[in-house]
Design a protein with these regions (language model features):
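Metallo-beta-lactamase
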Residues: 64-123, 221-234
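Short, surface-exposed connector motifs at secondary-structure boundaries
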Residues: 55, 131-134, 192-199
Length: 235
């Protein structure tokens, strides 16, 4: 998910839909967690923006556990070069920044706030605030007690991008793997005090229409939309 032109939230295969010029502008990546569908594009991004004469490094922000996984299993000199030591260890192109729940990272006119969420591995959601309001991304999560108080505390929540991976018929698998279903999501949405646009993401391929219909049926009073490649959100 590209924020303005310089920040990504997660770096999955979707970055392949960005133009080369778009990739060249990215200098900040916030990772929700270390699962492959959220980091698969990171090596190619680092390779694309690598320049021995760079002015601004590529900084990856994530929980300590996520950064350890990326360093050990991705940029380890075997799967992919360790760009945190290139072109020189004292001045690397790729830098890591630990971002823990409750931390705020300010980049220009935007504040990125990290929220603890409940997935099968340590994970984060993020709120992004600028002068126009607040945009929130849940990351992968199941029902939890941490995301909703943070969202309710936002002054002007305009957009919520939230995952819902499985239809209600697969509730057991969703719970075991740390994901929402339409039923569990809409139950949690009742706790939300704001009325933002709600964009659904992370749906399993082939299940999108059924999941969307189940969410809309369970929450007919909410402004539910389906996120797709190329969608542009304004805050």
């Amino acid at each position: 998910m590209l924020i303005d032109n310089d920040v990504l939230i997660d770096a999955g295969t979707g970055i392949g839909d960005l133009d080369l010029e778009d990739l060249d502008s990215i200098r900040h990546v916030f990772l929700t967690h270390a699962h492959l569908d959220h980091i698969a594009g990171l090596p190619m991004l680092a390779d694309r923006v690598f320049d021995e004469n760079f002015e601004t490094p590529l900084t990856v922000y994530a929980r300590e556990e996520t950064l350890r996984a990326v360093q050990a299993h991705l940029f380890n000199g075997v799967i992919w070069p360790d760009f945190s030591k290139l072109p020189a260890p004292e001045n690397p192109m790729l830098r890591y920044h630990v971002c823990s729940p409750g931390d705020t990272i300010s980049i220009d006119h935007r504040d990125f706030y990290a929220v603890d969420v409940m997935h099968s591995v340590p994970s984060l959601g993020f709120t992004v605030q600028n002068s126009g309001g607040v945009f929130a991304v849940s990351g992968d999560t199941k029902t939890n007690e941490t995301l909703w108080p943070v969202l309710n505390a936002c002054d002007d929540l305009r957009v919520l991008v939230i995952e819902v991976s499985f239809p209600d018929e697969m509730e057991s698998l969703a719970a075991d793997s740390g994901h929402y279903t339409p039923k569990t999501l809409t139950t949690d949405l009742e706790r939300l005090h704001h009325e933002p646009e709600i964009w659904l993401t992370g749906m399993k391929p082939g299940e999108e229409d059924r999941i969307f219909e189940q969410v809309v049926e369970a929450a007919p009073d909410k402004n539910i939309k389906m996120l797709s490649i190329g969608t542009v959100l304004h805050v």
